[in-house]
Regions:
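Bacterial N-terminal signal peptides that target proteins for export
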Residues: 2-14
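C-terminal motif of bacterial Sec signal peptides marking the signal peptidase cleavage site
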Residues: 23-24
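GH16 jelly-roll
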Residues: 27-284
């Protein structure tokens, strides 16, 4: 009888262990695949690990990203430098700084900045980062684009001027922009929304999202919709980009006391509604 009771006790223990393992695995699976920080409604988003990145390593994952823009040196006078890109403490960090580079190409001087571009292009989906913009007039930007000799399609999820010593509204402005260009005809269609915050965007972390479907583009900030437009032009697979640039003809170059800063990105996440359309980044 004692042995039988022991056997029953062992069986019960194993059953509990199996239930515990199953429950634990179920919870783990749910936590492993996050949902977009945005109203979902009836849409079903499928998380894509191949394109997403939590930046948990000690260096940039070069199977996913370039540490530069392969087709552009940066907006003059600021020069993109791979040395200004690093992964540290669970973040991708892009640095902009006041710096002279002795062998810089003509037109590049005074400032260096950073760019990270995906090695794949994707068509449609939900794109999201959690970040803290740079406290500088060297910009922080999250954008998608593709170009060839004929046209350029571009969706700027955000561009932020984190500091402006004479125009205090700039650091509170989140520019959400769309561009479509036919180079051979000199055509450039561009529109934007300037979404305002009560305080500068650099003072807190921001969750920035974009829903891009065949029918529409929708921009989100911290889960709130800030812009929606019909998708008239953006039907080509595009690269994913994070960068920092100096803008001499927009809000102006950094002041003499602005020596740059860091654009810190905690994660980048991508979801598709169906099978994702993923292509090699072959831009030239």
């Amino acid at each position: 009888m004692k042995n039988k009771a022991l056997c029953m006790s062992v069986k019960a223990g194993m059953a509990c262990l199996l239930v515990s393992m199953f429950t634990s695995c179920s919870v783990k699976t749910e936590q492993a695949f996050p949902a977009p920080v945005a109203p979902i409604g009836t849409e079903h988003w499928i998380y894509n690990e191949e394109i997403s990145d939590e930046f948990e390593g000690t260096s940039l994952d070069t199977t996913k990203w370039f540490d530069h823009n392969p087709t552009w040196l940066g907006r003059q006078p600021s020069l993109f430098r791979p040395e200004n890109v690093r992964v540290e403490n669970g973040q991708l960090i892009l640095t902009g700084k006041r710096e002279q580079v002795s062998d810089a190409p003509k037109g590049y001087h005074t400032f260096t900045s950073a760019a990270v571009q995906s090695k794949k292009k994707v068509l449609y989906g939900f794109f999201e980062i959690k970040c803290k913009p740079m406290n500088s007039a060297i910009s922080s930007a999250f954008w998608l684009y593709v170009q060839d000799s004929v046209k350029q399609e571009e969706i700027d999820i955000f561009e932020i001027c984190g500091r402006h010593d004479s125009l205090p509204d700039y650091p509170k402005t989140y520019f959400a922009t769309s561009h479509y260009m036919i180079k051979t005809h000199g055509l450039h269609i561009s529109d934007h929304v300037a979404y305002m915050s009560e305080t500068p965007w650099t003072e807190r972390s921001v969750v920035a999202g974009l829903k891009w479907t065949r029918d529409e583009l929708v921009w989100y900030v911290d889960g709130k919709e800030i812009r929606r437009r019909k998708n008239d032009f953006w039907h080509s697979a595009e690269t994913i980009n994070f960068d920092s640039e100096a803008f001499p003809t927009w809000w102006g170059l950094p002041s003499e006391t602005d020596n740059g800063g860091e654009f810190q990105i905690e994660y980048f996440r991508y979801w598709s509604q169906d099978e994702p359309e993923i292509y090699i980044n072959d831009m030239k």
